[in-house]
Regions:
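Glycosyltransferase specificity loop/lid
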Residues: 2-156, 266, 279-306, 310-330, ...
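Short, basic, glycine/proline-bearing loop/turn elements
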Residues: 14, 75-81, 96, 176-181, ...
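Active-site-proximal region of nucleotide-activated glycan assembly enzymes
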Residues: 124-215
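Donor-nucleotide binding loops and adjacent catalytic segments primarily
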Residues: 29, 209-313
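Short, compositionally biased "basic patch" segments
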Residues: 53-55, 60-67, 203-219
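Short gly/ser/thr-rich secondary-structure transition/capping motifs
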Residues: 86-88, 106, 185-191, 231-236, ...
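Short, flexible hinge/linker loops that cap or flank conserved catalytic cores
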Residues: 3-4, 199-200, 244-245
Length: 414
């Protein structure tokens, strides 16, 4: 990939198998493009969204998503092998030699801070607070069993317990995945890269969160909240739009790759016994199921903003991007999480009073629990009120513009 001496080139380096990791740098890239800054994407999976916005996308090796998310879903602390990390670093370096970027903008590429150091490149990363060492809330709340009547959650003792929780979970995770710190030591990195911070930036980290949703502690100056980055999908409404709404209300279901076998078949049967209307974005996971006019509408992909605007409630897997998208529309949420990140997100949803969590196993054993949760959340006014309050907080941010401002500034700083 040739480059003139006058041009400025960004390598956008997401984990291309996951839409959230792909869409966040895309939003920043669109803003950078307006400023005449060249952006080239890299990924194993070619993206229609990237190409629709006239960006070039070059191929690079990535971990197999089935294996990677399988390990994460099964709670394996060693989520990737040492050999895989080495293979990814080599792929990174070969990519840099091909593209000749001035700066690497990563999202979900956990070898990027190491490879950018080796190559002598500036590196900015997009990440959620939950994947940093500065998170104020434990990822796995191991002390939640302590009764609130014994230790109040507002007191100083509980704050010390949470700090201990954070220290222990990070130490255990970093020990299980020592390969990152071993590379850091061997290369003499100024910042020790660990399993906890491997998704953050070597030079700057963009936090795609708001502090009211995910607070931090002792945040350094090269970390900055920019607000959520949610892609506005340019997808035309289906022929049946708008949906016929029954008296039970309109529910939008979007589950990504759920990890729940036969999820939409269960939903299809469940909704027919209610007065609800469901619009579902299936990601192609429906087999031979079809829509039933006025009851359930199934589409592979939908304009989520369009549907959420009409909906009373959003049911999702607890993914960070979907939660923020729902809150941007002031809609309460029911989450059915299957991986630790999603469970972490849904604990915040419950803590903020904007929704409820249903356990994956609980849903599979007794699907009616979803109907009960829908009735409870839609029938309790405070959930919608809290969701609208969160909307007003999120509205203060323009993540794409803020992220682009920082990336552009980093191009001029060494």
């Amino acid at each position: 990939v040739s480059q003139t001496s006058q041009s400025r080139r960004i390598l956008a380096f997401p984990y291309s198998h996951t839409l959230s990791h792909l869409s966040r740098p895309l939003l920043i890239a669109i803003e950078l493009q307006k400023r005449n800054i060249e952006v080239i994407f890299a990924g194993e999976k070619q993206s229609l969204f990237v190409k629709q916005n006239a960006f070039e996308m070059v191929s690079v090796y990535e971990p197999d998503p089935q294996q990677l998310y399988g390990n994460i879903r099964n709670g394996k602390l060693r989520f990737v092998s040492n050999d895989e990390v080495g293979k990814m670093i080599e792929a990174d370096l070969e990519l840099y030699r091909r593209v000749h970027p001035d700066l690497v903008l990563s999202d979900g590429r956990f070898t990027a801070p190491i490879s950018a150091h080796i190559a002598g490149l500036k590196h900015v990363a997009i990440v959620n607070v939950s994947s940093t060492e500065y998170r104020a809330l434990p990822y796995v709340p191991v002390f939640d069993w302590i009764p609130k009547s014994i230790v109040t959650r507002e007191g100083r003792l509980w704050r010390h317990i949470e700090k201990l929780n954070l220290y222990l979970e990070m130490a255990i995770f970093n020990s299980a995945m020592r390969i990152f710190s071993e590379h850091s030591k061997k290369l003499g990195l100024k910042t020790n890269i660990t399993a906890t911070n491997c998704l953050t930036g070597k030079d700057f980290t963009l936090l795609a969160d708001i502090p009211e949703y995910f607070p931090t502690r002792n945040l350094p100056s090269n970390y900055q909240y920019i607000g959520p980055l949610t892609l506005k999908a340019d997808i035309k409404p289906p022929a049946w739009w708008p949906p016929k709404k029954r008296r039970g209300g309109l529910v939008y279901i979007t589950m990504g790759t759920t990890g729940i076998g036969e999820f939409f078949r269960i939903i299809h049967e469940l909704i027919q016994r209610t007065e609800l209307t469901v619009v579902a974005s299936t990601g192609g996971q429906i087999g031979d199921l079809s829509s039933i006019d006025g009851i359930i509408y199934l589409e592979e992909y939908l304009n989520g903003d369009l549907v959420m605007d009409m909906s009373d409630l959003v049911v999702c897997h607890g993914g960070n991007g979907t939660i923020y998208q729902a809150l941007q529309h002031g809609k309460p949420i029911i989450g059915i999480p299957t991986i630790p990140d999603q469970k972490f997100n849904m604990r915040r949803v419950e803590s903020l009073g904007v929704g409820k969590t249903i356990g994956c196993d609980e849903f599979v054993k007794r699907p009616d629990v979803l109907l009960e949760a829908i009735a409870y959340v839609t029938g309790t006014r405070v959930f919608a009120q809290n969701a609208r309050r969160m909307k007003s907080l999120i509205d203060r941010y323009d993540g794409g513009r803020l992220g682009a401002d920082i990336v552009e500034r980093m191009l001029t700083v060494w």
